[in-house]
Amino acid sequence: MTVSLDGDYYVRFIVRNVESSAGRRHGLVYSLTLHGPDKGILGFDNAHPVPPRKRDEPHDHLHVGDTVKPYDYTNAGALLQDFWTAVYSLLHERGLT
């Protein structure tokens, strides 16, 4: 699902159920992203492990610009809240809220 925000900004959600595994213990593959006029700005996803995590540890992580760091997934509600909090913070920094 893609939702247009203000001007050239939009968010995209891709979520699907999968069998639970070491990397996706909650049984979801997800990608929640904020895009701007030139590129992706923010993303929460679990497509792959992120150092220092190993392949058999949770794949959940956060991208802010070119920085990637582990994200501590607790539940879907907290993920959505954390995502929207980060979106509004970044849009505010850019003078869009």
Language model segments and positions:
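Solvent-exposed, non-transmembrane amphipathic alpha-helical segments
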Residues: P52, H61-V64, L96
